[in-house]
């Protein structure tokens, strides 16, 4: 059996933009040729694409770092550097992508072929041909390429199924799935034979079809990690109907009604929303003599928990082994699915603010000023730091341009207001310079 992996932590880094070029046209009979340096190419983005052929996140077990290529540098004759190709990362249907730092959901990938840009490549730096003006017709200025976005991500796979089978171990969930679909789950006369989710397609005699998922068995205390815990319950979150399978023969010595209550308590503890899904009670192993009396007692206890005007959950007596009662169960399940809408998986508060996350929202401050213990003024801020890394500090004209940009942003004035004096050290990242008043 292939290994099943439904969670992974990875890092992605988009490619840096290529640096712009400083070059001048030098040709015979072309005096004062002027600037001729081209722009750098765009860095490659990291894109997630859904592949319906994938079933687990196993590909991410050993490959956890994904880095797109950088754009090429600008060239002479005003030619642009070649942009880097985007890095396509394939994920299975049902993959939720979260920001590892905040836990917020970035995207939920459920459609085959669906694509999402997870990390955007940096834009190419401008060459000196872009900075020519009447006052400075031969500028020795070019920008460095913009760094690509870098993110730490958590991937979580929740398989796509319409119907989920839940219940204690060895109540017959896997047998039921194997009988009503072409799935071949492992079946055995011991607990936790099923240790990974299994998926099968079910077709009723009336022509309806739906996907059914068999989950590893739960036991009391699963929400505290007993048994296999609730690690696989995430796979039931996309389902619209739950089939609660109960061993009505009580062959394990447990009371069927207590089983029913215990499993529902575990579902509620794991995720309160799971109890919003309609349940059908599947009274299995009815071919065993004791099951009939147990079913009567079960119905009596169940009815005692409801008011006389409440609708009781539907109960279908079946025997997966003897193929009894299956047709009625499947038809009722299909009818319930037809009138049950999909459930909202995430609240608005669970999602990232897309404008802020992808840098579209305007920040309140372009920069911040702090002071270190050694009396150095420290400048920080996303916009300011982006300007800094795109400045070629090896060319005087580029440094002067950066100084003008800082002045235009109000950095000089803000430093004066904070008490900065002429000659005070100022630091941006690892670059240090003196404040000139």
Curated annotation (Swiss-Prot):
Its EC number is 3.6.5.-. Mg(2+) binds at residues 174, 194. Residues 2-160 form the Obg domain. It is an enzyme of class 3 (hydrolase). InterPro entries: G_OBG (IPR031167), GTP-bd (IPR006073), GTP-bd_Obg/CgtA (IPR014100), GTP-bd_prot_GTP1/OBG_C_sf (IPR036346), GTP1-OBG_CS (IPR006074), GTP1_OBG_dom (IPR006169), GTP1_OBG_dom_sf (IPR036726), OBG_GTPase (IPR045086). Its cofactor is Mg(2+). Keywords: Cytoplasm, GTP-binding, Hydrolase, Magnesium, Metal-binding, Nucleotide-binding. Residues 161-338 form the OBG-type G domain. It holds the Pfam family MMR_HSR1. An essential GTPase which binds GTP, GDP and possibly (p)ppGpp with moderate affinity, with high nucleotide exchange rates and a fairly low GTP hydrolysis rate. Plays a role in control of the cell cycle, stress response, ribosome biogenesis and in those bacteria that undergo differentiation, in morphogenesis control. This is GTPase Obg. It comes from Streptococcus pyogenes serotype M1.
